[in-house]
């Protein structure tokens, strides 16, 4: 059975694992999921991630981060969906919680945060919001 929205599935798995206070979460891997995990790691929302398993069915394992027993990620919300894509140009990229959170954007130069996209002068598809 194929998944309709693999990015939403990834975000839901991370959100549920953090609520259950799990140390890590695993899911089927893809290039876009690895790029999102890389942005989350660079921004300090997760400890690390690794891709394992065999070549036909790679698996993405994400080590979650907690601070004083509380999850670092407070909110993890999907912005764009397969049925309703959300594209923004560089001037209208959203600021999440007045800059305290990040929006993860897929641009022509790769997946990056809203701040990095603004600095590079790129717009793109807003994938999700993290706070």
Swiss-Prot record:
GO CC terms: ribonucleoprotein complex; ribosome
The keyword RNA-binding is assigned to this record: yes
Alphabetized UniProt keyword annotations: Ribonucleoprotein, Ribosomal protein, RNA-binding, rRNA-binding
Lineage: superkingdom: Bacteria
Stretch forming the signal peptide: none
UniProt GO MF annotations: rRNA binding; structural constituent of ribosome
Pfam family, any one: Ribosomal_S8
GO BP term, example: translation
Role played: One of the primary rRNA binding proteins, it binds directly to 16S rRNA central domain where it helps coordinate assembly of the platform of the 30S subunit.
Family stated for the protein in its record: Belongs to the universal ribosomal protein uS8 family.
Subunit field text: Part of the 30S ribosomal subunit. Contacts proteins S5 and S12.
The protein's name in its UniProt record: Small ribosomal subunit protein uS8
Taxonomic placement: Bacteria, Pseudomonadati, Pseudomonadota, Gammaproteobacteria, Chromatiales
């Amino acid at each position: 059975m194929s998944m309709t929205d693999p990015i939403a599935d990834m975000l839901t798995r991370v959100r549920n694992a953090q609520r259950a206070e799990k140390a890590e979460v695993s899911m089927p891997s893809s290039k876009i999921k690895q790029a999102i995990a890389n942005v989350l790691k660079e921004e300090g929302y997760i400890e690390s991630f690794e891709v394992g398993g065999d070549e036909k069915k790679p698996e993405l394992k994400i080590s979650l981060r907690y601070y004083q027993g509380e999850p670092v990620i407070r909110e993890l919300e999907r912005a764009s969906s397969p049925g309703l894509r959300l594209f923004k140009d560089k001037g209208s990229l959203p600021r999440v919680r007045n800059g305290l959170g990040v929006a993860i954007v897929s641009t022509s130069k790769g997946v990056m945060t809203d701040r990095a996209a603004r600095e590079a002068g790129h717009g793109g598809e807003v994938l999700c919001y993290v706070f």
